[in-house]
Amino acid sequence: MKAILCSQYCQPDDLVLADVPDPVAEPGQAVIAIKAAALNFFDILMIQGKYQIKPPFPFSPAAEVAGVIESVGAGVTDLKVGDRVIASCGHNGAREKIALPANSIVKIPDNLDFDRAAGIIIIYGTALHALEDRASPKPGETLAVLGAAGGTGLAACELGKLMGLKVIACASSDEKLEFAKAHGAELGLNYAKEDLKEGLRRLTNGKGADIIFDPVGGTYAEAALRSIAWEGRFLVIGFAAGDIPKMPLNLALLKGCDIRGVFWGNWARLNPEKNRANLEKLVAWTAEGKLSSHVDRTFPLAQTADALKVLAGRKAMGKVILHP
């Protein structure tokens, strides 16, 4: 089968399309014939050796896949050949087939296409865990989403609206804000034109946002924290800006607020049943049209480098998908 391989830490253009042996389903596993693999920003960091998870070489990028069950190993009873499924794989999704533990695979309905299905797991899984499990939101509270037109940010906008929150999209262009407003945001703040701290105070009539969802980091994090409401919750999702901010902890004291880390991957590993229930709920909501799982663009497997460069250049609004 064909696979995109990273054999040493490198840039996207250094990845190689190669032939590798087909996987075999061991006991408790199933082999998925991959129809769509979703890329995330951390895939770039992973191939560069800058991510906290460092798979052994050679490995493939792409941590979430959708496809069809091709074979099952001994002891697997809840999956059968031909089932349409999604799964989170951590890495190795940029290939034609993959063997995974059967208990990590979730079925999808016929009315949910593979491209949209592949993009559900990580961004919506992260956003749902962040908002539902870490933020403990109350209906009517204000949610400010940084990087609101990116994958995780867009998921937070949609889920925030479903939870009855007042969503403020924060992004670097008016085009991105309009996109976020079409996906659940009520208000928008262009932080390329207006100071983020002052803008959030203005849009909340001086109170500040109750929940701040930050997948961006960099200089925006402190500005957002300075605008947070009393007893607000600041959710640390990631650092797409590249810089990990150093936050003055006196702000947490003065605001009576919480700074809460969100590491969906580790939480999912430690809470597999709750994570599975979350994914099944997200699949149902997407199939029902309550969530968009918007796909920005697709690429054939051989053009994985081009797909990663779209993410690196902040050009995607929604998911970037590979077709093996």
How would you describe each model-predicted region?
Residues K2, V16, P21, A33, ...:
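Residues located in well-ordered beta-strands
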Residues P21-A38, K50-N92:
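Glycine-rich beta-strand-centered segment in the early N-terminal region that forms part
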Residues A33, L45, S71, R84-A149, ...:
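NAD(P)H dinucleotide-binding glycine-rich loop of Rossmann-like/cofactor-binding domains
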Residues V145, K161-Y220, E273-A277:
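Adenosine-nucleotide cofactor-binding segment
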Residues G153-L154:
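N-terminal Rossmann-fold NAD(P) dinucleotide-binding loop
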Residues V283, E288-R297, A305-P324:
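C-terminal capping/lid region of NAD(P)-dependent oxidoreductase domains
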